[in-house]
């Protein structure tokens, strides 16, 4: 016998409505998304698996799989970050010439203690263990199983085979209870796909120097002699003193001897006024790295002995579980040797080391560098197409960290990528336009100095001759980041660099330096890798060179300059070209969609550092 819910009664409109409500309630309590109305969205979307090449679905991730998650918290007063930076640059303002301590940042910008505790309690109640909050109160870490993660964040986790490796990722967005809406902005660690890659190019010397002495190799926007100047000699590989000479940090006669008297003592505390030139002796710098750096530290010592450089004190800080991975040794060798090399000396070098190259793990290393507040600059020679960190939520959290760095007077540097104006999802290959137009992150963050690449030509004694834009130099217009106030025409102070049709989007890069060539060496770095000499290049070279250049300038000003972004754009002349006579303006070459032009462009930014000139004219943001 079949029964009807309404068998004994006549079906009236009132009963029909009651039945409909009943079925909806029944469905609500029996559906997998029964509590959908109680969840709030975060910035973490479903992983864009369609962009993974050679990806094959395996099935649901085993519920017992151990996972480590990073929960990003919404900072307070987010709309006051740039106004505060502007106040720090404004004479007469009470904040003029200052920077925040970590404690001051937490008070004004960090999530509140009540919010942090609410997130920690939720995670603990959900079954997570080892729940800890970062000192700057921007994130909370926790360990849990896949089952706990899926339940706590109303998401699904799947396994995929990608190029023979098994990875997991979230196939649904991450959500949190509505009670945490506006508190949690992102949930990281829901995938272990290593999206970030280094921007390093290995190079070889040409058959003879005369092969390059006849002018540069053809570029996207080619020029050939007599249109292009011809250097007096072709210098294919560079040591630290060579870069110092080329970028006007030292004279050919004594590349490392030009040091102010105050900087030769045992203390850097005797600063009283800007010096005309110095080494980076009084400035601590950092490098965001990954894996086991045992050999990297040894290689730095070998490099210092090879080039008669002062030995730099080194500290390795793990931002997670120590990893035995050594696949990135050449990258971290390049970063450490060229940055301290062009600086000639720094007071201390810190490696902030991630467990892996995933967004979540590298984010922890970045946060360690920022919240430790030990350095005045740090380098990131890696990146990825910015739509990945936008979709997984790491962009919004990392931008909070970079904003904190700027407020604390720290300048992050990042490679603009090695794929010209495009960005292929599988990583850089040095081929412009191979992929859709996009910029690389973290370079596109407004609180990071994005560094593009050039081909540098010097005279026989390594003095500067000219530069041409490297055809693989990353650059363009961000799809997701807005232009900060300093990346604007200084004439009016309101019109952004990018055209109004781009709605004030962030332009990349900010500056550029030698990237070394694509296949044949043009200005490649001669470094030590695993105890032996090797030639390398890419924007992985130009970024640490820029950080080392900034270290010299900071030391010359007693580490009182603060975040570099607003300062370097103040050197520009204003609309319409934003030309800066204090940088080496690069006006030849291109990167695919964009061409190097007089003034600012989306290939080389403002140009390359003339260290001596910039050091002399950079706006002093501290009381005299």
Which ranges hold each PLM region?
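Substrate-binding/charge-relay-adjacent region of secreted/lumenal peptidase catalytic domains
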Residues: 37-136, 141, 146-451, 478-538, ...
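Predominantly extracellular beta-rich ligand-binding scaffolds that present long acidic/polar faces
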Residues: 448, 458-465, 546-554, 564, ...
């Amino acid at each position: 016998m079949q029964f009807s819910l309404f068998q004994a009664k006549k079906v009236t409109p009132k009963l029909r409505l009651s039945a409909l409500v009943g079925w909806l309630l029944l469905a609500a309590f029996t559906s997998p998304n029964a509590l959908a109305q109680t969840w709030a969205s975060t910035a973490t979307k479903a992983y864009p698996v369609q962009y993974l090449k050679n990806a094959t679905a395996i099935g649901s991730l085993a519920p017992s799989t151990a996972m480590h998650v990073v929960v990003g918290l919404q900072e307070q007063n987010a709309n006051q970050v740039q106004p505060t930076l502007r106040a720090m640059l404004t004479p007469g303002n009470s904040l003029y010439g200052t920077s925040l301590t970590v404690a001051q940042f937490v008070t004004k910008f960090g999530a509140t203690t009540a919010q942090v505790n609410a997130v920690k309690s939720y995670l603990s109640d959900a079954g997570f263990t080892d729940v800890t909050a970062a000192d700057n109160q921007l994130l909370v870490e926790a360990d849990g199983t896949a089952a706990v993660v899926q339940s706590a964040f109303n998401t699904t986790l799947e396994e995929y085979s990608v190029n023979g490796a098994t990875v997991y990722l979230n196939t649904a967005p991450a959500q949190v209870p509505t009670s945490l809406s506006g508190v949690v902005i992102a949930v990281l660690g829901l995938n272990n796909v290593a999206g970030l890659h280094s921007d390093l190019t290995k190079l070889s010397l040409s058959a003879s120097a005369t092969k390059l002495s006849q002018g540069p190799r053809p570029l996207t926007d080619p020029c050939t002699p007599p249109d292009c100047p011809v250097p007096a000699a072709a210098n294919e590989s560079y040591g630290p003193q060579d870069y110092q000479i080329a970028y006007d940090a030292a004279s050919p006669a004594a590349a490392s001897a030009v040091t102010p008297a105050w900087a030769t003592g045992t203390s850097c505390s005797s600063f009283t006024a800007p010096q005309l030139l110095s080494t980076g002796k009084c400035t601590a710098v950092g490098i965001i790295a990954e894996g086991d750096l045992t050999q990297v530290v040894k290689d730095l010592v070998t490099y210092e002995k090879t080039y008669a450089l002062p030995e730099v004190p080194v500290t390795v800080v793990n931002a997670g579980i120590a990893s035995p991975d050594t696949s990135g040794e050449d990258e971290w060798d390049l970063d450490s040797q060229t940055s301290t090399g062009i600086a000639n000396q720094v007071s201390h070098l810190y490696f902030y080391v991630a467990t892996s190259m995933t967004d979540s793990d590298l984010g922890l290393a970045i946060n360690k560098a920022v919240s430790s507040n030990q350095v005045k600059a740090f380098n990131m020679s890696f990146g990825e197409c910015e739509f990945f960190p936008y979709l997984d939520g790491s962009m919004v959290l990392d931008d909070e960290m970079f904003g904190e760095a700027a407020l604390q007077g720290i300048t992050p540097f990042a490679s603009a990528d090695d794929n010209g104006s495009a960005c292929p999802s599988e990583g850089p290959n040095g081929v412009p336009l191979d992929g859709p137009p996009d910029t690389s992150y973290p370079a596109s963050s407004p609180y990071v100095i994005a560094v593009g690449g050039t081909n540098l030509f010097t005279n026989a004694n390594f003095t500067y001759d000219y530069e041409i834009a490297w055809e693989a130099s990353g650059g363009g217009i961000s799809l997701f980041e807005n232009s900060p106030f300093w990346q604007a025409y200084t004439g009016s102070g309101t019109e952004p660099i990018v055209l109004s049709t781009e709605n004030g989007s962030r332009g990349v890069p900010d500056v550029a330096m030698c990237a070394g060539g694509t296949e044949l060496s043009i200005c490649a770095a001669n470094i030590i890798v695993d105890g032996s000499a090797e030639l390398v290049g890419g924007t992985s070279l130009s970024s640490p060179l820029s950080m080392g250049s900034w270290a010299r300038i900071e030391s010359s000003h007693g580490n009182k300059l603060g975040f570099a972004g607003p300062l370097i754009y103040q050197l520009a002349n204003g609309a319409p070209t934003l030309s800066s006579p204090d940088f080496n303006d690069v006006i030849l070459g291109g990167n695919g969609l964009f061409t190097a032009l007089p003034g600012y462009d989306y290939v080389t930014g403002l140009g390359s550092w003339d260290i001596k000139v910039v050091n002399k004219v950079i706006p002093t943001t501290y009381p005299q």
